[in-house]
Swiss-Prot record:
Gene name of this polypeptide: proB
Domain PUA: start-end pairs: 293-371
Record-listed substrate binding positions: S66, D153, N167
HAMAP family the UniProt entry points to: ProB
Keywords: Amino-acid biosynthesis, ATP-binding, Cytoplasm, Kinase, Nucleotide-binding, Proline biosynthesis, Transferase
Pfam entry (one): AA_kinase
Physiological role: Catalyzes the transfer of a phosphate group to glutamate to form L-glutamate 5-phosphate.
Subcellular location(s) per record: Cytoplasm
Family stated for the protein in its record: Belongs to the glutamate 5-kinase family.
Catalytic activity: L-glutamate + ATP = L-glutamyl 5-phosphate + ADP
Enzyme class (EC, first level): transferase
Official protein name in the record: Glutamate 5-kinase
Record keyword Transferase present: yes
Pathways involved: Amino-acid biosynthesis; L-proline biosynthesis; L-glutamate 5-semialdehyde from L-glutamate: step 1/2
């Protein structure tokens, strides 16, 4: 990095820090456990110390912490992480107690408390649940506590591998509840590299403006026996956070006082800079958290009207309906190429859309006996930039 680009990097980092009102820090299993699989209490304590310093600046501070299953495996003295659902659920419950206890002990001696928040994806799929979670996190902050969020592995079923996918995505979705957020993903590598981190010629990438296919191609994702995420998952989480307007830093959680360095404006890790335009409010929920209840397959004319001209979706542009959904449910939009390009809130139920598909709007009342809406999805309830799960 030359001097001018380094100065620009640092200036952008300082501006982001100045604008940040909420900080979401995610720390992975491999950062929180020792080489023999036990919970690293010293590292938990150092992280808690830095979280308190961030909170002392007046910023809302949220920790998304992995490690429950790993802590449970260590506590029970198991030789390896089980793969069956029943064991994983029980071990997560046992390990979560140790995990939250370690945070509480470290935070309490610094005048704060840990507030355990366990989530599944269903908690964020409904708009009401999405708002309830946000209100709860705000309430925790108002009491001066620090929320420690984890996926609720102990009651998840298939969710152990498919709810959020991993805690990186969970952290990005928690960040999406708020505005003016910085997301920090702490892992066991110092940054995103232009090659394999272990290769001597590989160089760290200090700043990324677009998580495109070229950036994704840099990682060879490996999911370990003690964690569910990988660098690919962190890039997808960064892209999701960026779509909300939130800058993201991927850095080393094993580096001592890494959070202090980030907020000192040092060039730590890789900074993912969001675009100027980003999803807000309800459209953010539609695009990243809401449950998708069905699919509408559109002709090219409808795709062009939506993508190029910002139009609402009319019934005449729908070729086929898949799934069962109600009025107000989120549906995905698929073009003739078979690829999803957007999501939106349907004004009609699935069986109604199937009946009016391909028909002009003026025929809706004749077909259904009523026409509460001229369009199937209003443009204000459409989101085109979708981050793949």
């Amino acid at each position: 990095m030359n001097e001018s680009s380094e100065a620009n990097d640092l200036a952008i980092r300082r501006q982001i820090i100045d604008e940040t009102k909420c900080v979401v820090v995610k720390v992975g299993t491999r950062v929180l456990t020792t080489s023999d699989g036990k919970l690293d209490l010293e590292r938990v304590d150092r992280l808690a110390e830095q979280l308190c310093r961030i909170a002392d600046t007046g910023r809302q501070t949220i920790m998304v912490s992995s490690g429950a299953v790993g802590a449970g495996v260590a506590k029970l003295g198991l030789p390896q992480r089980p793969t069956d659902l029943k064991s994983l659920q029980a071990i997560a419950a046992i390990g979560q107690a140790d995990l939250i206890g370690a945070y509480e002990k470290s935070l309490q001696k610094r005048g704060r408390h840990a507030a355990q928040v366990l989530l599944t994806r269903n908690d964020l799929r409904r708009r009401s649940g999405y708002l309830h979670v946000r209100n709860a996190l705000n309430g925790i902050d108002e009491l001066g506590a620090i929320a420690v969020v984890n996926e609720n592995d102990s009651v998840a079923v298939s969710e152990l591998k498919t709810t959020f996918g991993d805690n990186d995505r969970l952290a990005a979705q928690v960040a999406g509840l708020f505005n003016d957020v910085m997301l920090i993903l702490l892992t066991d590598v110092s940054a995103l590299y232009d090659g394999h981190p272990d290769e001597k010629d590989s160089q760290p990438i200090h700043m990324v403006h677009d998580v495109d296919d070229g950036v994704m191609a840099l990682v060879d994702d490996q999911v370990s026996t003690v964690s569910k995420g990988g660098m690919g998952g962190k890039l997808r989480a960064s892209k999701l956070a960026n779509s909300h307007g939130h800058p993201t830093i991927i850095g080393s959680g094993t580096e001592e006082f890494v959070l202090d360095r980030i907020f000192a404006g040092d060039a730590v890790g890789t900074l993912f800079v969001p675009p100027k335009r980003s999803l807000k409010g309800r459209r953010r929920w539609i695009g990243s958290s809401a449950n998708v209840a069905g699919t509408l397959f559109l002709d090219q004319g409808a795709v062009d009207a939506i993508q190029k001209h910002g139009r609402s979706l009319l019934a005449i542009g729908i070729q086929r309906v898949e799934g069962t959904f109600a009025h107000g449910n989120v549906v995905r939009l698929v073009g003739p190429n078979g690829e999803e390009f957007g999501r939106g809130l349907s004004n009609y139920r699935s069986h109604e859309v199937a009946r009016i598909a391909g028909k002009p709007s003026e025929q809706i009342e004749w077909i259904l006996g009523h026409r509460p809406y001229e369009n199937v999805i209003h443009r204000n309830n459409l989101v085109l930039r979708i981050v793949p799960e």
